[in-house]
């Protein structure tokens, strides 16, 4: 027969291939699929594979000019989700050639670009991605990574302490710098611009940069410790963002900050390259993540956004707090914390990790615990996150009845007490409150903080 068979086609004939052996170079994806009533799971899984790779809704003449077998995504396994009716995990393998090297932007446009609006699906969630080593090697990754950061800061054997300056909107640059100085002087390692502090009428970015730099050099001179303030370089255009980053470098500060989801992966990767070339650390905030990751059956899990950030580049990223949440969430959070920090992470479904991930020596990212935490949480945080983390107390520092500096002192004393207790072999989970109480006998600042935030 001449020509080809026209017409709308069944996806599963071409894109559902249960005998496919995945290649080491494939990008693997685990999707949680909720098909519309009457759509078989194989067809739904195949539709996802097709729509996110070579497929289109009908047979086209130009299909004859290419090798589908070489370029198509394949749904190679489907399993029902325990405890949910009509939900399936569809595993899809994508050939590496479908993706541009070193572009998180292109990876996401391909894998999650179009398929989420697909009619045959009621909902779709990307749960995990396996990034093959061949693709990982096309990315620079974090500007410096955990070890280099410790060496730059000369801080070892403990988590780092931070604080977001509040009220986040409305302070003048001079008063903002003053708040930064008080916190750093009191014993914090870092202070942070809030994610929505960019360059507003009440405080233009250059004024803030200047006063914050002054504050941190003064605190550095007085304490003999290296200090940092995350200067938020996020801006409306990439050019403006780079201008801010360059200004930070000229001031000689150690670290800048970026909102990677609202700023976009292209901007973030550009900034990460600049940071490595110019010796700046890069702190990443995840504003907008809940828009993408909060629904259990639709969107993308945060572990995917975290992996994407490690490829794109950042030295710190916000990762939730775990404290006071459900146990299950603790395991899941620790799963993606390991994916950020470790070089090799084994598949472990109980921790939400669908694929073994080998990062082939890509530098690690330090997770940042932030949001609603205070001194009584310190033992749990030290135990859960370990040394390679930043613990960020905004209200938990600035809410201290005696002011910012005593608030900073309280947090530092609590942290040092927890680290010492851990190193002496005490059980932080069981004796946490006792450890904090003992320490507060020697520190009136900590005692006052313990009073304000009673567990």
From Swiss-Prot:
It catalyses: 2 (2R)-3-phosphoglycerate + 2 H(+) = D-ribulose 1,5-bisphosphate + CO2 + H2O; D-ribulose 1,5-bisphosphate + O2 = 2-phosphoglycolate + (2R)-3-phosphoglycerate + 2 H(+). Substrate binds at residues 114, 164, 168, 286, 318, 370. GO terms for biological process: photorespiration; reductive pentose-phosphate cycle. The modification N6-carboxylysine is found at residue 192. Its EC number is 4.1.1.39. It is found in: Plastid, Chloroplast. It holds the Pfam family RuBisCO_large. InterPro entries: RuBisCO (IPR033966), RuBisCo_large_chain_AS (IPR020878), RuBisCO_lsu_C (IPR000685), RuBisCO_lsu_C_sf (IPR036376), RuBisCO_lsu_fd_N (IPR017443), RuBisCO_lsu_N_sf (IPR036422), RuBisCO_lsuI (IPR020888). The basic functional RuBisCO is composed of a large chain homodimer in a 'head-to-tail' conformation. In form I RuBisCO this homodimer is arranged in a barrel-like tetramer with the small subunits forming a tetrameric 'cap' on each end of the 'barrel'. RuBisCO catalyzes two reactions: the carboxylation of D-ribulose 1,5-bisphosphate, the primary event in carbon dioxide fixation, as well as the oxidative fragmentation of the pentose substrate in the photorespiration process. Both reactions occur simultaneously and in competition at the same active site. Belongs to the RuBisCO large chain family. Type I subfamily. This is Ribulose bisphosphate carboxylase large chain. It comes from Vachellia farnesiana (Sweet acacia). The gene is rbcL.
């Amino acid at each position: 027969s001449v020509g080809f068979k026209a017409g709308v086609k069944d996806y599963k004939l071409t894109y559902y291939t249960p005998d496919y052996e995945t290649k080491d170079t494939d990008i693997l994806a685990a999707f949680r699929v909720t098909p519309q009533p009457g759509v078989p799971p194989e067809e739904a899984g195949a539709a996802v594979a097709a729509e996110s790779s070579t497929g289109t809704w009908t047979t086209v003449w130009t299909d004859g000019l290419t090798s589908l077998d070489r370029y198509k995504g394949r749904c190679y396994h489907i399993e029902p989700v325990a405890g949910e009716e009509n939900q399936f995990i569809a595993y899809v393998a994508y050939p590496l050639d479908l993706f541009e090297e070193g572009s998180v932007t292109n990876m996401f446009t391909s894998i999650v670009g179009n398929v989420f609006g697909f009619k045959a699906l009621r909902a779709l969630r990307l749960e995990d991605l396996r990034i093959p080593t061949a693709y990982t090697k096309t990315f620079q990754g974090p500007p410096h990574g955990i070890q280099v950061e410790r060496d730059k800061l000369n801080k070892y054997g403990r988590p780092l302490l931070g604080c977001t300056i509040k009220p986040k909107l409305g302070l003048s640059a001079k008063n903002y710098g003053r708040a930064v100085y008080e916190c750093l002087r009191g014993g914090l390692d870092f202070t942070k611009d809030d994610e929505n502090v960019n360059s507003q009428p009440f405080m233009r970015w250059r004024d803030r940069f200047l006063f914050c730099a002054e504050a941190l050099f003064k605190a550095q001179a007085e304490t003999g410790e290296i200090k940092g303030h995350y200067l938020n370089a996020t801006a409306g255009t990439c050019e403006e963002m780079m201008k801010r980053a360059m200004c930070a470098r000229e001031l000689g500060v150690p670290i800048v900050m970026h909102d990677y989801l609202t700023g976009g992966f292209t901007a973030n990767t550009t900034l990460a390259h600049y940071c490595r070339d110019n010796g700046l650390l890069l702190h990443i905030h995840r504003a907008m993540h809940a828009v993408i990751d909060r629904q259990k059956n639709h969107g993308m899990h945060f572990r995917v956004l975290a992996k994407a950030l490690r490829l794109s580049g950042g030295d710190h990223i916000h990762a939730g707090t775990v404290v006071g949440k459900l146990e299950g969430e603790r395991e899941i959070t620790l799963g993606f914390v390991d994916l950020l920090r470790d070089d090799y992470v084994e598949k472990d479904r109980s921790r939400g990790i669908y694929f073994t991930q080998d990062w082939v020596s890509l530098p690690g990212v330090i997770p940042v615990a932030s949001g609603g935490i205070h001194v009584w949480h310190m033992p749990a945080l030290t135990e859960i996150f370990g040394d390679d983390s930043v613990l960020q107390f905004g209200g938990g520092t600035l809410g201290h009845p005696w002011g910012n500096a005593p608030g900073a002192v309280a947090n530092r004393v609590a942290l040092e007490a927890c680290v010492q207790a851990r190193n002496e072999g005490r059980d932080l989970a069981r004796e946490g409150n006792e450890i904090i109480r003992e320490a507060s006998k020697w520190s009136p600042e900590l005692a006052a903080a313990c009073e304000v935030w009673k567990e």
